[in-house]
UniProtKB/Swiss-Prot annotation:
<dbReference type="GO" id="GO:0003676">
    <property type="term" value="F:nucleic acid binding"/>
</dbReference>
<feature type="binding site">
    <location>
        <position position="14"/>
    </location>
    <ligand>
        <name>Mg(2+) 1</name>
    </ligand>
</feature>
<feature type="binding site">
    <location>
        <position position="52"/>
    </location>
    <ligand>
        <name>Mg(2+) 1</name>
    </ligand>
</feature>
<dbReference type="GO" id="GO:0000287">
    <property type="term" value="F:magnesium ion binding"/>
</dbReference>
<feature type="binding site">
    <location>
        <position position="14"/>
    </location>
    <ligand>
        <name>Mg(2+) 2</name>
    </ligand>
</feature>
<keyword id="KW-0460">Magnesium</keyword>
<dbReference type="InterPro" id="IPR002156">
    <property type="entry name" value="RNaseH_domain"/>
</dbReference>
<feature type="region of interest" description="Disordered">
    <location>
        <begin position="133"/>
        <end position="155"/>
    </location>
</feature>
<keyword id="KW-0378">Hydrolase</keyword>
<dbReference type="GO" id="GO:0043137">
    <property type="term" value="P:DNA replication, removal of RNA primer"/>
</dbReference>
<dbReference type="GO" id="GO:0005737">
    <property type="term" value="C:cytoplasm"/>
</dbReference>
<feature type="binding site">
    <location>
        <position position="74"/>
    </location>
    <ligand>
        <name>Mg(2+) 1</name>
    </ligand>
</feature>
<protein>
    <recommendedName>
        <fullName>Ribonuclease H</fullName>
        <ecNumber>3.1.26.4</ecNumber>
    </recommendedName>
</protein>
<dbReference type="InterPro" id="IPR036397">
    <property type="entry name" value="RNaseH_sf"/>
</dbReference>
<keyword id="KW-0255">Endonuclease</keyword>
<keyword id="KW-0540">Nuclease</keyword>
<dbReference type="InterPro" id="IPR012337">
    <property type="entry name" value="RNaseH-like_sf"/>
</dbReference>
Amino acid sequence: MSEADQKPVIIHTDGACSGNPGPGGWGAILKFGDVEKELKGGEPHTTNNRMELLAAISALEALTRPCSVDLYTDSQYVKNGIGSWIHNWKRNGWKTADKKPVKNVDLWQRLDAALKTHSIRWHWVKGHAGHAENERADQLARDGLTENRMKSRVK
């Protein structure tokens, strides 16, 4: 069966941050046919952009074999980074047009590695606009933020 014949894995991602920077969380929903998996996590001191990236990375890294993927994000940062900026960053040695180091380069490089493994079609959706899966991913991200905040208080 060719990749074009494969049913795609559908992924919805979101990130959340309380303060920016501050504690953050990320969430992702992966669907393949009738199978669905939810992922979430967080960090004690991060930014919203890092959480948006980590949601996409974590979802793609959870796939156990090369897949055809439709990935939905409400992040303009992720959309523009993957659709436009990353090509020039790589060509410029991970520097911006202003010759400054790319922010979040560690995560962009992980996402770039996932691009080599999977065939990904990127889709942008407006956040908080009633897209059911985006709202679920947002709730997972907020849950990840809350759980991480509680863990950091217990330590």
